[in-house]
Amino acid sequence: MPLTPPPNYTGLYIAAALGVSLAAVVALFTRSTLPIVGDSQHNLPHGGRYRDGTKAIDYFKPTKLNSVEPGNYWYTQPWLLVILLVALICLSGRHAQCCPRCNRVHSA
């Protein structure tokens, strides 16, 4: 009776991780986080004006998402801070390769 290696499930795990990641990205990018204005028949999420005989709605576009974003300048956006912090962490982790036994850098 020959010995056989166990089945390799890495392809399955990679496909499952990609599927879950794709579903999460699609769900996050397709949901609306804008404030809902109007009633069940008249929805004005991007601003606008609606008038009929008994009611009038004037709603202007949302200006900013939160108090973290002070303006429309690129250097005041929170995503820039995230990118800079990730780059700083990645660059600070690049140090000389140390020998795991003696904890010194050897020349090649």
From Swiss-Prot:
Gene Ontology annotations for the cellular component aspect, listed alphabetically: host cell endoplasmic reticulum membrane; membrane
GO biological process: transport of virus in host, cell to cell
Pfam family of the protein (one): Plant_vir_prot
Location, primary (coarse class): host cell
Location of this chain's protein in the cell: Host endoplasmic reticulum membrane
Residue spans crossing the bilayer: 9-29, 73-93
All ranges on the Lumenal side of the membrane: 30-72
This protein's UniProt keywords: Host endoplasmic reticulum, Host membrane, Membrane, Transmembrane, Transmembrane helix, Transport, Viral movement protein
Signal sequence residues: none
Top-level taxon: Viruses
Family to which the UniProt record says this protein belongs: Belongs to the Tymovirales TGBp2 protein family.
Remaining remarks: TGBp1, TGBp2 and TGBp3 seem to act together for cell-to-cell propagation. TGBp1 is the main movement protein that physically cross the plasmodesma with the viral genome. TGBp2 and TGBp3 would facilitate TGBp1 function.
Function noted in UniProt: Plays a role in viral cell-to-cell propagation, by facilitating genome transport to neighboring plant cells through plasmosdesmata,.
Protein name: Movement protein TGB2
Protein source organism: Potato virus S (strain Peruvian)
